[in-house]
Amino acid sequence: MLYADLYLLKPALIDAEQLIRLQSELSPDEYRHWHEIRQPGRQREYLLGRILLRRLLAERLGCPPDALVFRTGEHGKPTLVSHDWQFNLSHSGDWLVLALCQQGPLGVDVEMGLRQRPVLPLAQRFYAPEEYQWLLALPSRAQTSAFYRLWSRKEAVLKA
């Protein structure tokens, strides 16, 4: 069994003054990447995700956050150099989620289901025929939440 720590953060609760102070905790590469993000909400998510990740990993490893070195893998997923901690970040709507573990690769996904859209065409296109049939068999009022639950699980597996 895999044991992981999950952290939820609502980025909108962090005020502008705190965001300015937190920028100094980014590495030079992280700062450059953060600065290149043009959409303010995405910029806030990136900053807070990286700071949360650095602080929590540093706490577990007994080192300062700026001592952590990350490398980007061939598929763009960052990894921690020289340590066995695994992590994954996701965001949707007003929420940011971080998962940490030492037992192997993990993925996490959060979907708030805020977009009101017909989910059956998406399910027919992206899900296996058995999954699509399962979704069709549900009462119509349950289909949207079931769609997003399955979508999140699939996304988390792919991110691992």
What is the meaning of each model-derived region?
Residues 1-160:
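Core catalytic alpha/beta fold that binds nucleotide/phospho-ligands
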